[in-house]
Amino acid sequence: MKPLILASGSPRRKQLLEQMNVPFTVCKSTIDETFDPTFPPDEVVQQLARQKAQDVAKKHEDSFILAADTIVVFQGRILGKPATEQEARQMLSQLSDQSHEVLTGVALLHQGQVETFVETTEVRFWPLTDTEIETYLQTGEPFDKAGAYGIQGLGAYLVKELKGDYYNVVGLPLSRTVRALKVHGFSTRF
């Protein structure tokens, strides 16, 4: 079996794979993650995941590469990671008492062949007060996460309802990813 490389610097994706006893190493992709906002969100996440995998494969040609990209989509608009506190505040205000989608594109690459899929989860926030938003901003948690929140941390307080894969919102649709790895011969707990 070829070694598995996670093409991500995300500590959350690393923790999720470790949780499932999947043997892997990490090699962070260095691609420019800007995208054309006119593209459909599912194409954006698949393309970014594919580009990350291809970037890492240049250094690890014989390895099996796993890459992912997660975005939040609100009213047809992609919300990435906020660049400023004001942007994070605006995102959280928009998401207050509303539903949005979290999409993760996953790419599995080996010997030039790429398989991709997209997982979508619907999330609804509670109505948030300005004080709740400001308190959450002060934690620093919103700034490295798409949509300005982390469901696995203090951001769980914001979430009223979830339809779909919880782990997808964290950053990697775990069951579907591990099942895909298993199809390719990777050892898992199952």
From Swiss-Prot:
GO terms for cellular component: cytoplasm. It catalyses: dTTP + H2O = dTMP + diphosphate + H(+); UTP + H2O = UMP + diphosphate + H(+). The record marks R12, T70, Q152 as: Important for substrate specificity. GO terms for biological process: nucleotide metabolic process. Pfam families: Maf. It is found in: Cytoplasm. Its EC number is 3.6.1.9. This is dTTP/UTP pyrophosphatase. Nucleoside triphosphate pyrophosphatase that hydrolyzes dTTP and UTP. May have a dual role in cell division arrest and in preventing the incorporation of modified nucleotides into cellular nucleic acids. Transmembrane segments: none annotated. GO terms for molecular function: dTTP diphosphatase activity; UTP diphosphatase activity. NCBIfam families: maf. It is an enzyme of class 3 (hydrolase). It comes from Halalkalibacterium halodurans (strain ATCC BAA-125 / DSM 18197 / FERM 7344 / JCM 9153 / C-125). Gene3D superfamilies: 3.90.950.10. Belongs to the Maf family. YhdE subfamily. InterPro entries: ITPase-like_fam, Maf-like. SUPFAM superfamilies: ITPase-like. The active site is at D69. Its cofactor is a divalent metal cation.
